[in-house]
Regions:
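Phosphate-binding site recognition
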Residues: 1-336
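A cross-kingdom feature that marks ATP-driven nucleic-acid transaction machinery
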Residues: 306-483
Length: 483
């Protein structure tokens, strides 16, 4: 059963309904669900779906010819295969689809280009001369994000400016991901999402009839299951110096987020080299560099500023719990690793993913105009500002601190400060006062609202004071079941 991806399906169907030729580039990291999304889109439509392989150009051309000939095109009456790519690709115009769009999907298109670098030029010539004004739709799909972004979509590439649509597929959000385990409790949905993230391939390995703990033991920590070797497989497929990348990813997963800290923890002494490795991981969609939501452009461009974090929840889980315990897992001590390593730390581990869930919740509320104001920027904030200090005369002091979620309107005259707590105890009154104390200097020229997000409800004092302090309270049930 196909789950989610309504936005992607709408985008593709809208393009399909448009008149004239359509040339779509759809790309994203491996396992994100591109192929399945395209196959779902093709259902009920006459089409050719061709999956490229890592092979020689003559074999690729032969395989493409074989696939095209199955569509009963006129050429099959006098040839068994095309002799060149220009004739092969032009044959799209001969597909016997009547008034329907002649739909061609080329999956893993970078493999085709690697075997024959002239493919983009051939396609460009056909597009300019014939395809642009014809009833065709060609979708070029690929996982090699660096190739697509730096070469295929660059100004130097023959296809530059020809695409009528460019769509970068990202992993599913929380609300789509939890459709894979609809009967879980609200808390378990957050825990499962914290472990798996929004990668469909990972979500399908999960048995929704088993508990979160049992799934972790059976489908992640047990040698031989798909997810046990997934991280190692992906890194070896995409990168060369896997031992170094392992060290860097582990350092980030364990909470080292600054460039210098990552370099020291991973024992890559040269930060410039560490920066290059991190850049490669960012291109693969495994790591991202996060700057404060109000950072200026100069700060955003400086790799020494901001923090690095793993964007893939499953990578974060594996390097937090599996990677350092592989010897025990290889010996079959799955229960021991789970009981003594994973289970005690899982709620704390999930608290980071809960922040992502809360940010997604806020984005969805904005779509429905259910926030106090419309924000222009939303994200994490870090820097020096006021914090609560009862020993100080004013009750405040200046210190480095973070804000889980900060929304700022277009004029920077209205703010929403959000704090997220994923724990079994209610959001305490002391934590509430800590939240109110932050960014006090800005309150002289801006209106402030507050939003508290909690797994286990709120202290009664908070509930009593919330309205007069412009504080919105969102319990777990409200967040998880919003959509």
């Amino acid at each position: 059963m196909f789950i989610g991806r309504e936005t992607e399906q709408k985008f593709l169907n809208d393009k399909y309904e448009e008149s004239g030729g359509q040339l779509i580039v759809l790309y994203g990291r491996r396992r994100v669900g591109k192929t399945e999304t395209l196959r779902e889109f093709c259902k009920g439509k006459p089409h050719v779906f061709f999956s490229c392989t890592q092979t020689t150009d003559p074999v690729q051309l032969r395989n493409f010819s074989t696939r095209m000939m199955k569509e009963d095109i006129p050429a099959k009456d006098y040839i068994s295969a095309f002799t060149d790519w220009e004739r092969a690709l032009r044959a799209v115009l001969d597909l016997p689809y009547g008034n329907s769009k002649k739909l061609l999907v080329i999956d893993e298109f970078p493999y085709m280009c690697k075997g024959n670098p002239s493919i983009p030029s051939i396609l460009q010539n056909l597009w300019d001369a014939e395809f642009r004004d014809s009833n065709v739709m060609i979708i070029l799909c690929g996982s090699a994000m660096s190739f697509i972004e730096k070469e295929m979509l660059s100004e130097k590439n023959p296809l530059y400016g020809r695409a009528t649509g460019i769509y970068k597929m990202r992993e599913m959000g929380f609300y789509d991901a939890v459709k894979f385990f609809p009967d879980y409790s609200d808390r378990d949905k957050v825990l499962a999402y914290a472990v798996l993230g929004g990668i469909p391939h990972y979500l399908r390995q999960w048995n929704p009839g088993l508990s979160v703990g049992e799934n972790i033991k059976r489908n992640i920590l047990t040698k031989g299951c798909i997810l046990y070797s997934e991280v190692d497989f992906l890194l070896h497929q995409e990168l060369r110096e896997t031992p170094i990348y392992n060290s860097i990813i582990e350092a980030v997963a364990l909470g080292n987020t600054k460039l210098n800290d990552i370099s020291q923890k991973s024992l890559v002494e040269d930060t410039s080299k560490t920066s290059v490795y991190l850049k490669n991981l960012m291109e693969l969609g495994i790591v991202e560099r996060e700057v404060s939501v109000d950072a200026k452009l100069k700060e955003q461009a400086n790799s020494n500023r901001g923090t690095y974090r793993l964007t893939d929840n499953f990578f974060r889980f594996w390097y937090a719990f599996g990677f350092a315990n592989v010897s025990q897992l290889e010996d079959g001590d799955v229960n021991g690793v789970y009981e003594f390593v994973v289970e005690p730390e899982l709620p704390k581990f999930a608290s980071f993913a809960f922040e992502d869930v809360c940010r997604e919740f806020v984005r969805e509320m904005q779509k429905k105009n259910e926030l106090p104001f419309r924000y222009a920027k939303m994200g994490r904030w870090a820097g020096k500002t006021t914090v609560r200090d009862d020993s100080a005369a004013s009750g405040l002091r200046i210190a480095e601190t973070e804000i889980d979620l900060l929304c700022i309107d277009r004029t920077a005259k209205e703010y929403l400060v959000g704090e997220c707590k994923f724990k079994k105890a209610p959001f305490s009154y002391s934590e509430y006062l800590d939240t109110l104390a932050k960014l006090t200097p800005q309150k002289e020229h801006a209106k402030f609202h507050y939003a508290l997000f909690s797994e286990s409800g709120f202290d009664e004092k908070i509930i009593a004071e919330a309205e007069k302090s412009n504080t919105l309270l969102y319990p777990l049930q409200c967040i998880v079941n919003y959509i």
